[in-house]
């Protein structure tokens, strides 16, 4: 969100050396955000497996919002900050400020929706997740991420609601005494500061904390259940062991994904919390926060727009593979290996603690065949195809049965 870019009445501007350093830093931040978010969008569009994951719809929309922040907001802000002047007129100042509030709030809302999606995926039954996260509901959530921020951006800013009671202060701050020019100044009164900060940051932050806390508790319970299943299956037959191994892998994958998103949320809090705390405090202390503090907190928040793609690359294996394929021009080394005996999984109903149907792909006489069998899996784990090479007694029984039927 844009904030007062120059407090000329009580602060000195940046020196020549500082401007060169800042311009270099801003250029790196903007370039990193543009390339990184474009890479995320292209990766999901090209990778069919990434498109199958519902969470990635939010990630693509988030990348688009962060891309617009870099192109439409950061670039103009960097030019104004370095040159100590706003060239583009009062109307475009209002548009740019409104876009700033809209896009950064939309980015925060997307992170909140991602945390809720992961909560339903990990803490609820798979059937409950499918029923709740329908294509229609996902579309409504994505629409809300873009529409709701308009009510705290374009609507109040274009109507001047944020200026009520502080017009004189804004007029003093807009004028640059050194160059007889003006700045694009965005100041907010107390009601707008509280409303905007609560809607754009504090409510999403609270929802994310609650969601990730429940994810942590559920993942911890699942880890204990998996250990119990592994100990109980140590002396059992191979088929239950295979199911337990499959359940363990599934839960570890979900838990790792949750940890990745927790890191993303942690970076988001580190980047945006200083700004939103100051945004509420400043109107109550007569707007005495120094310009350079505002600049630092504002651009710390902007850095978050370029940080998310690199978090995906380093912490998410699927995205890392997709990025390598794109950057290495479809190098075959990074493509997913084909799955032998790939078939449609058996129809299952997954209920907490109930019996599930799993499909095994086994080798019989040099041919891969798919079969279904019942097994007890850990709670909240949906049945998926399992490929295994059966034991000798399995091969003997299954092949002899096939010969007798023929």
From Swiss-Prot:
Serotonin binds at residues 100, 279. The keyword Glycoprotein applies. Its main location: membrane. Residues 1-19, 79-92, 158-188, 284-290 are extracellular. The keyword Membrane applies. It is a multi-pass membrane protein. Residues 45-54, 118-133, 213-257, 315-406 are cytoplasmic. Glycans are attached at residue 7. The chain crosses the membrane at residues 20-44, 55-78, 93-117, 134-157, 189-212, 258-283, 291-314. InterPro entries: 5HT4_rcpt (IPR001520), GPCR_Rhodpsn (IPR000276), GPCR_Rhodpsn_7TM (IPR017452). It is found in: Cell membrane; Endosome membrane. GO terms for biological process: adenylate cyclase-activating G protein-coupled receptor signaling pathway; adenylate cyclase-activating serotonin receptor signaling pathway; adenylate cyclase-inhibiting serotonin receptor signaling pathway; chemical synaptic transmission; cognition; G protein-coupled receptor signaling pathway; G protein-coupled receptor signaling pathway, coupled to cyclic nucleotide second messenger; gamma-aminobutyric acid signaling pathway. One of its GO terms (cellular component) is membrane. One of its GO terms (molecular function) is neurotransmitter receptor activity. Interacts (via C-terminus 330-346 AA) with GRK5; this interaction is promoted by 5-HT (serotonin). Belongs to the G-protein coupled receptor 1 family. G-protein coupled receptor for 5-hydroxytryptamine (serotonin), a biogenic hormone that functions as a neurotransmitter, a hormone and a mitogen. Ligand binding causes a conformation change that triggers signaling via guanine nucleotide-binding proteins (G proteins) and modulates the activity of downstream effectors. HTR4 is coupled to G(s) G alpha proteins and mediates activation of adenylate cyclase activity. Specificity for G(s) G alpha proteins is determined by the length of transmembrane regions 5 and 6 (TM5 and TM6). This is 5-hydroxytryptamine receptor 4.
């Amino acid at each position: 969100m844009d904030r007062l870019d120059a407090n000329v009445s009580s602060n000195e501007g940046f020196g020549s050396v500082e401007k060169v350093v800042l311009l270099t830093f801003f250029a790196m931040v903007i370039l990193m955000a543009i390339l990184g978010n474009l890479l995320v969008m292209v990766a999901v569009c090209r990778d069919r497996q990434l498109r199958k994951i519902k969470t990635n719809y939010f990630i693509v929309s988030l990348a688009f919002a962060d891309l617009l922040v870099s192109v439409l907001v950061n670039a103009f802000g960097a030019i104004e900050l370095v040159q100590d002047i706003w060239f583009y007129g009062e109307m475009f100042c209002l548009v740019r400020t409104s876009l700033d509030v809209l896009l950064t709030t939309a980015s925060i809302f997307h992170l909140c929706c991602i945390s809720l999606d992961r909560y339903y995926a990990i803490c609820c039954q798979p059937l409950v997740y499918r029923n709740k996260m329908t294509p229609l509901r996902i579309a409504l959530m994505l629409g809300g991420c873009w529409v709701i921020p308009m009510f705290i951006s374009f609507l109040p800013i274009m109507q001047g609601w944020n200026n009520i009671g502080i017009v004189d202060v804004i007029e003093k701050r807009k004028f640059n005494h050194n160059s007889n020019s003006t700045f694009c100044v965005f100041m907010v009164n107390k009601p707008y500061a509280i409303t905007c900060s609560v809607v754009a940051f504090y409510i999403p932050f609270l929802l994310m904390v609650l969601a990730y806390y429940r994810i942590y508790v559920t993942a911890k319970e699942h880890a204990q259940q998996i250990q119990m299943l592994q100990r109980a299956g140590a002396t059992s037959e191979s088929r239950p062991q295979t199911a337990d191994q499959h359940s363990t892998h599934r839960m570890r994958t979900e838990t790792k994904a949750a940890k990745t998103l927790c890191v993303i949320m942690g970076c988001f809090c580190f980047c945006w919390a200083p700004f939103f705390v100051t945004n509420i405090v400043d109107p109550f202390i007569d707007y005495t926060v120094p310009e350079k503090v505002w600049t630092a907190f504002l651009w710390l928040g902007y850095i978050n727009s370029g940080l998310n793609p690199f978090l995906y690359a380093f912490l998410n294996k699927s995205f890392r593979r997709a990025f390598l394929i794109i950057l290495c021009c479809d190098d075959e080394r990074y493509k997913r290996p084909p799955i032998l005996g790939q078939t449609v999984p058996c129809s299952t109903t997954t209920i907490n603690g109930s019996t599930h149907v799993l499909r095994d792909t086994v080798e019989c006489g040099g041919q891969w065949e798919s079969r279904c069998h019942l097994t007890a899996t850990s709670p909240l784990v949906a049945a998926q195809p399992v490929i295994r090479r059966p034991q000798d007694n399995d091969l003997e029984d299954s092949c002899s049965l096939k010969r007798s039927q023929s």
